[in-house]
Every structure is written in C-alpha cells, then in structure tokens.
Amino acid sequence: MTQQSLEPRTVADDAGDKSRVPAGRSWLDRYFHISGRGSTVAREVRGGVTTFMAMAYILLLNPLILSGEDAAGNTLGQKALITATAFAAALSTLLMGFVGKVPLALAAGLSVSGVLASQVAPEMTWAQAMGMCVMYGVIIMLLVVTGLREMIMNAIPLPLKHAITMGIGLFVALIGFHKAGFVHQGKSTPVTLGPAGELAGWPVLLFAATLLAIFMLQARGIPGAILLGIVGGTLPAVLLNALDVIDPGQWASGAPELHGGAVSMPDFSVFGQVEFGGWGDVGAMTVGMIVFTLVLAGFFDAMATIIGVGTEAELADARGRMPGLSKALFIDGAGGAIGGVSGASGQTVFVESATGVGEGARTGLSSVVTGLFFAACLFFTPLTAIVPGEVAAAALVVIGAMMMMNARHVDWSDRATAIPVFLTVVIMPFTYSITAGVAAGVIAYVAIKTARGKVREIGAFMWALTVIFVVYFALNPIESWLGVR
C-alpha cells in the first residue's frame, strides 16, 4: 500500500501537542490528532482491527508456554491464563493508545514467557515468578526515566542483539516442536523424532499440516496468516474429534470440544497472585541472573520495534525521534508489571503493529480499537480454549522462524562476529537457557576482540557483563571451593 508523505509532526517529546489540527474537528480528532497526522477515523479503526487479527494468536500461544509446572508442582489453569493474557494485552494496549497516542499494540512477549516457564518457574512458585516479572517491569521503567535504557541499548553490539533474537527464536521453536509431540526425549539420544523415532497419531500430523499451511500463507503474503492457519487447523481437529476418529487421550491439552456455551465470564483466579518473598531459597546470584535475563528478553526488541513502526507510520524524524517516544517506552516497561500482576507474563510492543500501520493507522485510536478487541475476548474464553495445543504449537515454530530471519543482518564472514553469534544462538536451545546463550556470546565476543587487539572497541559495559557471566558459569565450582555448597 502506498503511504502518504507526511512530515514529522513533533520532536521526540510527547505526542502531538504541536500537531496542526484544523478548527471544528471532533473531540476524537483533537485528542488523537487524527487529521494532524493525515489519517481518518475509518483508517484508524481498520488499522486497529488488522493489528488485532495479526496478533490474536498470542491468546493461544502464551497459555501454551505457561502451562508447565512450577517448583511446587502447581500449574496455572488454561482458562485463567487466557483471561490473564487477554486482560493484560487489553490494558497495556489501551494505555498505549490513550496515553502514548501512537499506533502500537502490546501483548505477552513470548521471549519473556519462555524465560518464566523454562528458567524461573522450575526454581520457585508461579506467584514468585510473576513477582520477578513485576520487578523486571519496574526496572525497565526506571531505565527509561533515567535515560539508561537507550545507553545500554547502544552499548550492546548490534550482532549480539540479532543473535539474542535468533537464539530466542530457536528456543521458542523447540518449545513448539516439543509441545506438539514432534520432538521427544530419546532413550539413547538427547532428542528424537516422535516418541520412538517416528511420528505417531493424528494430532502431530495436524501440527505438521498447520505448520506448512501457515508457511504457505505467509509465502503468499496473506494478512493474518498465523491466525488463519490456527483456525484452519482447529476446524478439522474439531471434526475428527466429533467423529471419534481420534482417541481423546492423544490430544496433549485435551480434546478440542466446546464445553458449555461460547460465551463465559472471565476467570481472574491468577490475577494478583504475586509474591516478592521466598527468593532466598534459590540464592541472590540466581535471582539476579533471572531478573537480568528477563530484562534482556524484553529489552532489545521493544525500542527497535517502536522506532521501526513509527518510521513506517512516517511519525519519526531523520534521527529516529517520534511523537510519544518517551511515553511509549515507559508504557512498554509498565507492561512488564501489568503482565506480572495479571498472571500473563511481561507485555511488550508487537511488531505486528506494522500491519495496522500498513492499513493507514497513524494514531493511538487504532491501539484503542485493538485493545477493545482484546477486552472483548475476555468473554469468549471457551472459543479460544477449543484450539488444540498441537495446532497452537505450529504458530510457535512459525514465530521462531520469523525471529531467525535476523540472521540476514549478521556478517558471517567476520569470525569476531560470527563465532559469538553462533554460540549465542545454539546454546540457548541446547541448554534450554536463554541466560546461558547470552553469557556465552558476550564472553566470546570480548575474548575474540581482546585476542585481535581491539580492546577499545569493547566498552566498559561489555567488560562488566563479561565478569558477571564468568562468575555465573563458575558459580558452582566457586561455591564448592569455598565450602558453601
């Protein structure tokens, strides 16, 4: 779609007070500066609906990732997780619309959810894990207020930023393959295809068919490919289950059938289930690394996404500054705390916001529309819960593949870049630890730069990270040597 040529309306400070709005416009126009940004109410509504359709899959994927047990063996209910995911996305996106006044939508970040499920919950209770999420959100907000967020962003080498995104992509894809039953732990090998070296059962075949269908839709450039693929995979699943073709026990998350009506009251049972105590059992070093990993997981993509979508909407100037940038970054950080209190994990800006911009969205009104759609989903939990876990898992693999596309930005001919990137990317899924991947990449980057005599290119922040990560890897031997373990 050809976009209109719009000059930037303001500088980096907050949204739109200086936008030129003709007299006689409606309060809606005046508040969101719709005319001032060359848009219309119809375009904003269309953009908001498009953005929702592009990211509605999160209502299925986030509960799937957070479905595991915590250290006490407790799990979070699927209906409660769907409610929490919809509520947190609605509140965060509405805040971005009404306060930030920019066309950005937020929802649970799969990278943050992956850290919570794989590294945090196994060490503590889910309530304590959500407390960690709140802490991560508060830290992000403090970094924005103090101006340190941008400083830290600039201190991390760009190749490592891409590597972290790629590594999390592989990590998320592995979760998807495992949830679908496509990959199992083998008896004589770490992993194997299916439970015995082969695919078994209709559900896993439905996963494979859904995965291919989404990839084909994306290759054709079909809008909302992920959501369409999920719907397309769910319909035959419901039919096969209704015809008793599949044993209900084969479905990983229960048979795809509607229990009761399509409409129900939201389940807020996990809302407010947050604890900030009891972290001493896992150790201060572990707590610090977990919080640091959560910050990393939700840190890097947000600013790039905000600036990227702002540029696409022609709101950013030549220096990448855009109306409402400071508020948008702060709300993105607040999303971490909102997600933790809601029980949905940290909220972050979704790159799918660009789909709404492509339909003409230029203001926060489109975000309000998207947020209202998420709010409406609170009352349609049964329809969301009917989607089989195997079908939703296909979307996880697709998201992982999309994150891996950052590989095109890496200079693979430069070993000083390629080796740290490689270690970051592969160690995350191989160790099932995002922290370990980041640590390996940082240490390798500093070591190789030092070996090449380019110490000045490293920077104080990277040196500090290297020391922290060396201690992280050597913590067990150090504790044994000191006799404290």
Please report, for each region that a protein language model flagged, where it lies by residue:
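Residue-level signature of catalytic and energy-coupling elements of molecular machines
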Residues: V45, I65, I152, G224, ...
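Membrane-embedded alpha-helical modules
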Residues: P122-L235, L239, V368-R485
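Helix-loop-helix hairpins and the membrane-proximal interhelical loops
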Residues: Q3-L6, T10-A80, V191-A196, I230-S326, ...
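Hydrophobic/aromatic residues within the transmembrane alpha-helices of Major Facilitator Superfamily
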Residues: V49-A56, L91-L94, F98, A173, ...
